[in-house]
């Protein structure tokens, strides 16, 4: 079993051509699409594109053999911790390192004309509120999961979950913001 937690995990996994005979699981549609570029069809959770969604998917079938969870350094270890606690042989591989910028000045300018911000990770929320957000801004915040909503709430801001992988993202944004 090989579980990819993000598109970046796929991009940075240097042995991608050696996993043909493995059960491949992707965290969500974006990760699955990245695997398709290498001609792999991955299983993905039905709805909840999260660690919990992966765990639910795994629990629907028999887990056999070893499992490798490929992720970014500093990413969540919920899947590995769950599998290890259930006595399944599980390893993690950090295929990339998340890095913050030295300066956010240029990026901050890009938000000056924005009406909303979509957050796809807890790290993006942290960076935004620590380095980019201006308290005078009246932006609306959207999150790709309830977990990200909770992180946004920790900054005392409200947000809504959006189906980021919708076939019509523009319409999804309009529906969510109304």
Positions of predicted regions on the chain:
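Conserved beta-alpha
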Residues: 1-178
